Amino acid sequence: MTSVLLLRLAGPLQSWGALARFDRRDTLNRPTKSGVSGLIAAALGLDRTDDLGALTDLRFAVRADRPGIAVRDFHIVGSGTYPLRPRDLITDHRRAEKAAAALDTSTGPVFGHLAARSVTKWYGAPKEVAPDPKTGVLLAGNTTRDAMMTTRWYLADAAFVAAVEHPDQDLLYRISDAVEHPKRLLWLGRKSCPPSGTISGGVHPGTAETILTTTALLPNATSPQPWAWIEATPGTPGAAQRTDQPVTYHPEGRTHTARWETRTRVSPEPTIGWDIIP
């Protein structure tokens, strides 16, 4: 027999990456298995290089009680002039020498106020910092850079109910305790998206399908029949493939494989309620 741990995933912003290049980072319309498994791994205190063990065997489902609103965050990074900072005098002595005259004659605040015009082609975040082959002093190999434009998508004011199913009830209880007393910082897809309030909805006997159907809607749910995505076995009629089954989160070789899921409307007839701090 299996049991299910309910997870309340709510916060001002969430972002569950479908595409993660530097210049464009999308979000799906619901949490991914990889993202939620990563949150669980962080709560348990696992390193990125650690084996995921039983976490790879969790069966995953998610219900969109409040889908939220997609918002775009547009950034322009680099180019232009930047205030001088103390670290800038350390990372390249050539720039420090050029700034010395202005530093010596300044009578007011210097750092954060002295602009780049006294230092030709100054850029405030040096790249390619390495020791000078002749002197051993740190030099910035790239002190100029064209502006970079990035677009990042988020879900605003969304709330989801995730269900993770496993036959080992003790494992689910450990996860339930860990998400409320995490060993590492937790986030909803990205580091800029912390969760709010209570996360654990408790451990309940049953399958992901039955528990999502018998669990009350979260406050301010937008529909009495929300959509749910439920992990399925390959070949299940109507199932779609998703490549978000985590294998490893190793920073030098993060790997995911395919899994299958179905999408359906659920009409909760609650016997399980929520005792949450928003």
Question: What is each of the regions a protein language model found here?
Answer:
Residues 1, 54-56, 154-156:
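Solvent-exposed loop and beta-edge segments used for protein-protein assembly and interaction
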Residues 1-21:
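N-terminal, Lys/Arg- and Ser/Thr-rich interaction peptides
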Residues 2-7, 24-29, 117-130:
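Generic detector of short, locally flexible boundary/turn motifs and exposed helical patches
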Residues 12-13, 31-36, 132-137:
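N-terminal start-of-chain detector that recognizes signal peptides
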Residues 20-102:
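Glycine/small-residue-rich interface belts in oligomeric ring/scaffold proteins
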